[in-house]
Swiss-Prot record:
The protein, known as: Pyridoxine/pyridoxamine 5'-phosphate oxidase
Entry EC no(s): 1.4.3.5
Cofactor(s) essential for the protein: FMN
Phylogenetic lineage: Bacteria, Pseudomonadati, Pseudomonadota, Gammaproteobacteria, Lysobacterales
Free-text comment on the cofactor: Binds 1 FMN per subunit.
Annotated keywords: Flavoprotein, FMN, Oxidoreductase, Pyridoxine biosynthesis
Amino acid sequence: MTDLYAEALATFAALYAEAQNSAELEASAMTLATANVDGRPSARTVLLKAFDARGFVFYSHLDSAKGRDLQTHPQAALLFLWRSLREAGIQVRIEGGVQLVSADESDAYFASRPRMSQIGAWASLQSQTLGSRAEFDAAIAKVEATFEGREVPRPEGWGGFRVVPQAFEFWYGAKFRLHERWRYEADAASHWSKRMLYP
């Protein structure tokens, strides 16, 4: 890990801790932007579940729209917006390639989830058309009956994705739109640079 990458990661960690201890309702909420095989972009909010020097991890159904996007076009952008921080909020952008996390990591995280969340992962055919709420409720009841009295295993089609950073951008809001921006970016040889940007 290069010094500048370590600096960017440490900066994120400090800001994330600040957001977790602030008035933010959900500091781990991040916008995930992907593109499908035709290059059509899509964005949605997901929750950050872990981060370290290897990257930023979230979990999903692998056959969801985002899962299909990431398996056919394994690049993504993340956006954290913490409005309650500092003078006028802080925004962090992270861009990078995407990898599936190991089965062991996915198993460990799935086992830590509330039981009803585990059941929901089995019952939901994420991103597919649903005829009615009653249909979903019936699927939930069926899964509950199937696993009654025993642990709920991780579905084969459910797992984690890791965004491996190739760029970080930190935006510090200020009055009169006189913001401060810093960008860390890796080149093709994985050499990191740091520069200040006009707001």
